[in-house]
Amino acid sequence: MLDIKRIRNNPEEIVEALKKRRGEYPIQKLLATDEKRREVIQKVESMKAEQNKLSKQVPQMKKNGEDTTELFKNLKKLSDDIKNLDDDLKDIDDEIREYLMEIPNTPNKDVPVGLDDTENLEMRKWGEPRKFDFDIKAHWDLGVDLDILDFERATKISKSRFSVFKGKGARLERALMNFMVDLHTDKQGYTEMNTPVLMSPSAMMGTGQIPKFKEDMFYCEKDDMYLAPTAEVPVTNLLGGEILEQGSLPIYYTAFTQCFRREAGSAGRDTRGLIRNHQFEKVEMVKFVEPSTSYDELEKLTNNAEEILQLLEIPYRVVRLCSGDLGFSSAMTYDIEVWMPSYNRYVEISSCSNFEDFQARRANIRYRDENNKPQYVHTLNGSGLAIGRCFAAVIENYQQADGSIKIPEVLQKYTGFDIID
């Protein structure tokens, strides 16, 4: 969430920044409630000063044999009034926090202003899309024809938009996961984590999934827990409520998890194949860094994700999201989009974001600076990568005229085979 002091001191700046997101946010309600809070605090402090003043009169009045009945009556009333105002203050604090939870992060000054993904800014491309001299197949047809994907049985045991990986397909999926995690841990300096996927409401709140996106989540009502939509939630919240010792940053974590999303607002989009499933696998990278380094760390994070596609030798491009396409918690995001031959376009396979101190304030993650003073960390995360989409990109880009699929050389030590036919 945003710093209430920043909003209070620079309301016009915040309003102008949030206009770029094209939404309606309760800034004025927040400021009015904040003003009310300060008035109540001032009133409480005045009453406490009066209470203290009257209390000091008691010993002298008793010493002089004076009647203290009226004095104690006044002290009792002051005490009751202070308690009532303290209760009001708790309600006001809750109201302020609710407003803050509804307000998204402010876009970084270098984020392009735009309405939707058509106005994202292309930063760079890598590789050239392969020119096929035969009629290509989409990954869902390739997978079924080679008996490595089974959508029909997945629907039978669950519902639509679930997938079963089978035989060499299951091996290829596992190979991708192992390859990604090994790259992040052995070469890029991340520590591997294995976390739960059932999340408490406070964890979901910490990274910004709720309350804004509650309807997109799978919720276990009986236990009041959510299925994690991304490893960003458990991994970021691992350090929730902690003050990290001076010199402990940066911290890099990576995790492979199952992810679960209702995709409530995506009806009719990418409903075939592996692109938009309710359950999917993903390797996530999460960073906790000092504020002064966070944008350099964002570039490194994005490069870490890009390296996977470079080693797989699959073309991709990197775009900087415009303000209208930017995620709720993000100050800046790069999307990596992989070339998908059947779509004849680039498709998102990773989002790499700098949240600045937005998530850290919600989850209360701090570190001690050089003066030993607690400060909020900056958090970043990125997909490294979405495995289902990467699987789809591999089999589409490596399909052969005879219907077989070559295995990228970098994966062969993980699969134990070099072709699926």
Swiss-Prot record:
Family annotation (PROSITE patterns): AA_TRNA_LIGASE_II
Entry's free-text remark on domains: Consists of two distinct domains, a catalytic core and a N-terminal extension that is involved in tRNA binding.
Chemical reaction(s) catalysed: tRNA(Ser) + L-serine + ATP = L-seryl-tRNA(Ser) + AMP + diphosphate + H(+); tRNA(Sec) + L-serine + ATP = L-seryl-tRNA(Sec) + AMP + diphosphate + H(+)
Pathway(s) this gene product operates in, as recorded in its UniProt entry: Aminoacyl-tRNA biosynthesis; selenocysteinyl-tRNA(Sec) biosynthesis; L-seryl-tRNA(Sec) from L-serine and tRNA(Sec): step 1/1
EC number, UniProt record: 6.1.1.11
Keyword terms, alphabetized: Aminoacyl-tRNA synthetase, ATP-binding, Cytoplasm, Ligase, Nucleotide-binding, Protein biosynthesis
InterPro entries reported for this sequence: aa-tRNA-synt_IIb (IPR002314), aa-tRNA-synth_II (IPR006195), aa-tRNA-synth_II/BPL/LPL (IPR045864), Ser-tRNA-ligase_type_1 (IPR002317), Ser-tRNA-synth_1_N (IPR015866), SerRS_1_N_sf (IPR042103), SerRS_core (IPR033729), tRNA-bd_arm (IPR010978)
Primary localization class, coarse: cytoplasm
Family: Belongs to the class-II aminoacyl-tRNA synthetase family. Type-1 seryl-tRNA synthetase subfamily.
UniProt KW Cytoplasm keyword: yes
Protein name in UniProt: Serine--tRNA ligase
Function: Catalyzes the attachment of serine to tRNA(Ser). Is also able to aminoacylate tRNA(Sec) with serine, to form the misacylated tRNA L-seryl-tRNA(Sec), which will be further converted into selenocysteinyl-tRNA(Sec).
Location in the cell: Cytoplasm
Oligomeric form and interacting partners: Homodimer. The tRNA molecule binds across the dimer.
GO CC, one annotated term: cytoplasm
GO biological process per UniProt: selenocysteine biosynthetic process; seryl-tRNA aminoacylation
CDD domains: SerRS_core
Ranges in a coiled coil: none
EC class: ligase
